[in-house]
């Protein structure tokens, strides 16, 4: 089973659903059939499955898990969209259909611990699934990376390519304000020995990238300036070599904003997992 080979997803215009992440990872069904119980379920998410840019984040995180010796699995074709965009858009019926389907599968496998690279999936699995009978320990990948680093399972090379470079970090709304996870991503970046330059609006006062609350899937509203352009400008103002994100949607919005300003040569947007994967021994 390949990462991203999901049964159901959000389909964006022009999206090729047949382009998968070519990386072999065990599914829950395969592991249970062989009498194994994984330590953690990696919830890939729609973006991480079908968006070509986000697939790189998925591969990077899976590579880290493999190198760190984590016993994990994915759902594969059994993973459907969490229903987050449906609920944010006001389609409660659709959300509950999707959520109950996922919960039935998760509970059927007696899942206890879930890790995901998507703050949207993280937030809804952690905070909204319990009301429907889905009770799990849900952690974001930056939290898991911090744990693995502290446990010595992730070792960073002294000569990693990020060392001495400057970076600014964008706080995802669902990770930051919604769940108050500010330090884990920054602690992980500290391990790379980079210079962290905070944007003028950060942490609890951070500005949305423009994709939150299902805004990524609707037409823009009239205004003087696109939200992602405003945020990209704040990132560019820090004169950092890199912009780190911890959300596939934020990554897309910031990348588009920086390209629009013709700054992609000077400032590259990367997920924290991509940076750690390259820096590992």
How should these model regions be labeled?
Residues 1-79, 83-117, 122-129, 148:
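Iron-sulfur-cluster electron-transfer modules
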Residues 92-94, 126-127, 180-181, 185, ...:
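Iron-sulfur (Fe-S) cluster-binding segments and ferredoxin-like electron-carrier domains
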Residues 132-161, 201-204, 262-281:
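Short, flexible loop segments at boundaries between secondary-structure elements
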Residues 44-49, 77-90, 115-124, 170-178, ...:
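Local cysteine-cluster metal-coordination motifs and their immediate loop/turn environment
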Residues 59-71, 182-195:
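Short helix-loop-beta junction
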Residues 139-144, 150, 163-178, 195:
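Catalytic cores of enzyme domains
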Residues 50-57, 148-149, 173-191:
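Active-site glycine- and acidic-residue-rich loops that bind
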């Amino acid at each position: 089973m390949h990462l991203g080979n999901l049964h159901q997803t959000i389909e964006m215009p022009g999206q090729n659903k047949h382009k998968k992440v070519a990386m072999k990872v065990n599914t829950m069904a395969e592991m249970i059939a062989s009498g194994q119980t994984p330590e953690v379920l990696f919830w890939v998410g729609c973006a991480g499955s079908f968006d070509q840019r986000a697939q790189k984040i998925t591969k990077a995180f899976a590579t880290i898990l493999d190198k760190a010796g984590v016993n994990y699995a994915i759902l594969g074709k059994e993973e459907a969209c969490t229903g987050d965009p449906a609920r944010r858009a006001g389609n409660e019926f659709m959300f509950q259909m999707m959520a109950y389907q996922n919960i039935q599968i998760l509970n059927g496998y007696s899942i206890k611990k879930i890790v995901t690279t998507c703050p949207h999936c993280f937030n809804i699995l952690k905070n909204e699934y319990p009301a429907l009978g889905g009770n799990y320990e849900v952690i974001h990948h930056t939290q898991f990376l911090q744990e693995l680093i502290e446990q010595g399972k992730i070792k960073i090379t002294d000569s990693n390519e990020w060392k001495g470079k400057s970076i600014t970090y964008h706080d995802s709304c669902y990770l930051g304000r919604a769940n108050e996870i500010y330090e884990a991503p920054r602690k992980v970046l500290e391990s790379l020995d980079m210079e962290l330059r905070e944007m003028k609006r950060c942490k609890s006062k951070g500005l949305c990238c423009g994709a939150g609350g299902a805004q990524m899937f609707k037409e823009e509203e009239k205004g003087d300036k696109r939200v992602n352009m405003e945020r990209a400008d704040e990132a560019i103002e820090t004169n950092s070599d890199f912009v780190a994100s911890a959300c596939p949607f934020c990554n897309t919005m910031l990348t588009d904003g920086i390209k629009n300003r013709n700054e992609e040569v000077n400032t590259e947007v990367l997920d924290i997992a991509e940076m750690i994967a390259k820096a590992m021994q």
